[in-house]
Amino acid sequence: MTNDIAILKVEGLTVYQGSYLAVRDVSFELLPGTDTAIVGPNGAGKSTLVKAVLDLIPRSSGTIQIFGRPIARLGRLRHLLGYMPQNFIFDRSFPISVSELVGLGWDKEAKKGDLFFSRLWRQDREKSAAVGEALRRTDAYHLQHQAIGTLSGGQLKRVLLAYCLVMPRKLLVLDEAFAGVDVQGAADFYALLNELKRQEGWTVLQVSHDIDMVNRHCDRVLCLNQSIVCTGKPEIALSPQNLLATYGPGFSRYQHQH
C-alpha cells in the first residue's frame, strides 16, 4: 500500500428491493493494493451490495466514493474501474469473436494525458497488442478467434477477466468470478490477482463462496448477511465463531470449497 487514501469508501449503504430489505447500513473502505472478499450465505445481499456500490442499482440511503469522488461524478476516471458480473447474459448466436469482445474494453481516449496509464503502459501501445496480452495473462490466447457463443463456462470466465485487463485499472470488482472454475483455474486466477495487486497496484473487491481460497489469498474479509457481521483479516473474520454468526447453524466451511 502506498498511502492511506481509500480507493473505495462506502458509508451507511442500505438497499431495498421492493419491500425487501436486501442490504442494511453497510459501511467499509478499501485501501490501495488490497484484495478484499465479501462472503456470506445465499441471499445475504452480496451481489446486491456490489451492484449498489457500482451504482448499477438504486440505493435507498448511503454514500459511495470511488477514487475520492462520488460514484455519480466519476466521469473519465470510470475507465480505471473494472467489473466482472456473476452472470454474463448474451445471445450465443451473436457473431463476435473472443478478441473482438475483449477489444470492446479498450478505450483509446483514456490514455490521453492519463499519468496512471502512462506510468504502467507504453503510450504507443496498440489495441491488438493490449488484447493479446490480456488474453495471454488469463490463459485464453488460444481462444482469440473463437466465437464467444462456443465457449465453455470456464473459458468465458477467462475471457471476461481478459476484458477487464485490457486496460489498466485501479479497482477491479469481481462477483463470483471463479464460480464453476476448477481448482487449478481458481489458483491461476488468484495468482494473477496477486500479481496485479503487488506489481501494478490494483485494488480488488470480490464476492466469493470459496472460504478456503479467500483465507489463503485475500487481505481482508467482509462477512455479510444483509448487514456486516464482521470484517478484518482472514484469520480473524473467518474464525469458527464468526462463520457461525454469518452462516448460521449447520454451516461447514468445507461445503464452500472447490
Task: Tell where the protein language model's regions lie, with residue ranges.
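Catalytic Walker B motif of ABC-type/P-loop ATPase nucleotide-binding domains
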Residues: 172-176
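H-loop/switch region of ABC-family ATPase nucleotide-binding domains
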Residues: 208-209
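H-loop (His-switch) and adjacent beta-strand-loop-beta switch element
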Residues: 220-234
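Conserved ABC transporter NBD signature motif
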Residues: 62-79
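Conserved ABC ATPase signature
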Residues: 147-151
